[in-house]
């Protein structure tokens, strides 16, 4: 059975977790074994806990009114998911599925371990600030494949 390890920063009811929810339901119905690593927040991804082939791993992540706290929490999650990823170091044929630009820690770990790293790119990083542009650059360096939600996004990437 093929194994997919999926990383999504914030479980909520916004667009990217809704798309991810549909994709993972479809893959689990086809018999893929999926480990989903996401936040403990209540969100659409909670529906996947009833899927036969989906196992969920959760961490604490919250936004704050203080931008410094938010970035520190974000950095903590990147270190945590980077370290968490190494539980798959000896597993063959594992795909690391990175939903959005934000989970860069597990993408880096996957690349270091020689895993296939697939990004699902939802954001328009080039319309946002330096932080997102940096994440988009890192995505292009780390990804084996990039799934874009639009041709507009694809055309803004150097790695096609």
Regions found by a protein language model. Name each.
Residues 17-25:
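A conserved mid-protein helix/loop that constitutes part of the nucleotide-sugar donor-binding site
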Residues 69, 87, 118-144:
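A conserved, positively charged/aromatic
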Residues 143-160:
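A short, active-site helix/loop in glycosyltransferases that binds the activated sugar's phosphate group
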Residues 43, 77-81, 95-113, 128:
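An aromatic- and histidine-rich active-site surface loop
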Residues 5, 73, 84-103, 116-118:
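Short N-terminal targeting/anchoring amphipathic segment
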Residues 6-14, 26-72, 153, 158:
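N-terminal strand-loop element at the rim of the active site
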Residues 9, 61, 99-101, 121-124:
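Histidine-centered beta-alpha loop that forms part of the nucleotide-sugar donor binding/catalytic region
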């Amino acid at each position: 059975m093929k194994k997919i390890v999926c990383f999504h920063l914030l479980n909520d009811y916004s667009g990217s977790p809704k798309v991810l929810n549909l994709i993972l339901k479809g893959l689990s119905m086809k018999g893929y074994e999926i480990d989903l690593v996401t936040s403990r927040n209540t969100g659409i991804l909670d529906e996947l806990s009833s899927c036969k082939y989906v196992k969920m791993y959760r961490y604490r992540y919250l936004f704050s009114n203080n931008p410094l706290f938010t970035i520190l929490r974000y950095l903590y999650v990147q270190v945590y998911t980077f370290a968490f990823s190494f539980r798959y170091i000896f597993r063959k044929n594992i795909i690391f599925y990175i939903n959005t630009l934000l989970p860069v820690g597990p993408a880096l770990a996957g690349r270091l371990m020689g895993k296939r790293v697939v990004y699902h790119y939802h954001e328009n990083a080039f319309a946002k600030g330096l932080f997102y542009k940096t994440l988009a650059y890192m995505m292009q360096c780390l990804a084996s494949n990039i799934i874009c939600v639009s041709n507009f996004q694809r055309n803004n990437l150097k790695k096609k």
